[in-house]
């Protein structure tokens, strides 16, 4: 009975599938033989693959396959080979100071490459992928160093961090809040003077008064010339590099309620070798001393 209702296309003489969409019918042509054979071939290939390689998940592991192949075992072999190739350089790094590593061209090249990888994983989240930093996070490409840019000084900062309380050798500096010590007028004068060191202030007539306020309250840390003090971690205010924000209002805000960043001590987390590699990498960025 069903054959009596089959529709045949008048032009091609081929039966249709019997369905119609907005007057459009589909010819019931058989699939090309090459397509059918290809389809069967993929089925055979899949069955062969499932037999030869690990494929079917079990309760504790997958079937091992007739070839006994394991991608994890292959990766383990490659990792072991890579570690063996690096062993010589790593041994030299372990027994050398940061300065000695930099003095050895081959070892420096290895340390810079390894340090760059460690930087991307552990440091780029704050300092940026290009180490250019951001507001509150120092730019590591320039030569504006709070604690010094010599190899061992960089190592010390990375190893023990900044204001990382659990580490007894961490870098520590703290600017007191001047909001309770100075009037708004005095802070405005000081901000005018600080800004005048690198650009034109909005109120030039306050600069001389601010210079005196600075000498009385700020020079003990930042220096009489406002160029900072690395022993105390006091930043240079006479350059055009601003860590917490630029302009008089940013200076006033930092004076009134100072913000102090925290950098973790990386030595316990990464180990001495990796910290040395990071120090060599940061030193190589262009601002190292």
From Swiss-Prot:
Role this protein plays: C-type cytochrome. Part of the cbb3-type cytochrome c oxidase complex. FixP subunit is required for transferring electrons from donor cytochrome c via its heme groups to FixO subunit. From there, electrons are shuttled to the catalytic binuclear center of FixN subunit where oxygen reduction takes place. The complex also functions as a proton pump.
Disulfide pairings: none
Protein name: Cbb3-type cytochrome c oxidase subunit FixP
BP terms from Gene Ontology: oxidative phosphorylation; proton transmembrane transport
Cofactor binding notes: Binds 2 heme C groups per subunit.
Chief location category: membrane
Residue ranges the record marks as coiled coil: none
Sites where the protein binds heme c 1: 123, 126-127, 263
Domain Cytochrome c: 110-198, 205-286
Chain segments annotated as transmembrane: 34-56
Family: Belongs to the CcoP / FixP family.
Subcellular localization(s) per the UniProt record: Cell inner membrane
Assigned keywords, A-Z: Cell inner membrane, Cell membrane, Electron transport, Heme, Hydrogen ion transport, Ion transport, Iron, Membrane, Metal-binding, Oxidoreductase, Plasmid, Repeat, Respiratory chain, Transmembrane, Transmembrane helix, Transport
Periplasmic side: 57-289
Gene Ontology cellular-component annotations: plasma membrane
Residue numbers on the Cytoplasmic membrane side: 1-33
Residues that, per the record, bind heme c 2: 175, 218, 221-222
Single annotated GO MF: oxidoreductase activity
Known pathway: Energy metabolism; oxidative phosphorylation
Requisite cofactors: heme c
Assembly and interaction partners: Component of the cbb3-type cytochrome c oxidase at least composed of FixN, FixO, FixQ and FixP.
Membrane topology (UniProt): Single-pass membrane protein
Lineage: Bacteria, Pseudomonadati, Pseudomonadota, Alphaproteobacteria, Hyphomicrobiales
Ribonucleoprotein keyword on record: no
A Pfam family this chain is assigned to: Cytochrome_CBB3
């Amino acid at each position: 009975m069903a054959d009596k209702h089959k529709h045949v296309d008048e032009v091609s003489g081929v039966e249709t599938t019997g369905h119609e969409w907005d007057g459009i019918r589909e010819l019931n042509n058989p699939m090309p033989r090459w397509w059918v054979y290809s389809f069967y071939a993929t089925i055979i290939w899949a069955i062969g693959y499932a037999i030869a390689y690990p494929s079917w998940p079990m309760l504790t592991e997958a079937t091992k396959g007739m070839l006994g192949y394991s991608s994890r075992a292959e990766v383990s072999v490659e990792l072991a080979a890579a570690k063996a190739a690096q062993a010589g350089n790593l041994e030299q790094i372990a027994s050398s100071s940061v300065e000695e590593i930099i003095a050895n061209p081959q070892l420096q090249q290895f340390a810079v490459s390894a340090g760059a990888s460690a930087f991307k994983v552990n440091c780029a989240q704050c300092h940026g992928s290009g180490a250019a930093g951001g507001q509150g996070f120092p730019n590591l490409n320039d030569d504006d160093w709070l604690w010094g840019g010599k190899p061992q000084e960089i190592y010390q900062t990375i190893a023990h961090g900044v204001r990382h309380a659990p580490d007894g050798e961490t870098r520590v500096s703290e600017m007191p809040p001047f909001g309770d010590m100075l009037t708004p007028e005095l802070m405005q004068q000081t901000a005018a003077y600080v800004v005048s060191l690198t650009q034109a202030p909005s109120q030039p007539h306050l600069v001389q008064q601010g210079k005196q306020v600075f000498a009385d309250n700020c020079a003990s840390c930042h220096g009489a010339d406002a160029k900072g003090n690395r022993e105390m971690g006091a930043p240079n205010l006479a350059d055009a590099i601003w860590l917490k924000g630029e302009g008089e209002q940013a200076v006033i805000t930092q004076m009134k309620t100072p913000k102090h960043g925290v950098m973790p001590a990386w030595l316990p987390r990464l180990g001495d070798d990796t910290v040395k590699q990071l120090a060599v990498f940061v030193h190589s960025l262009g601002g190292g001393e």
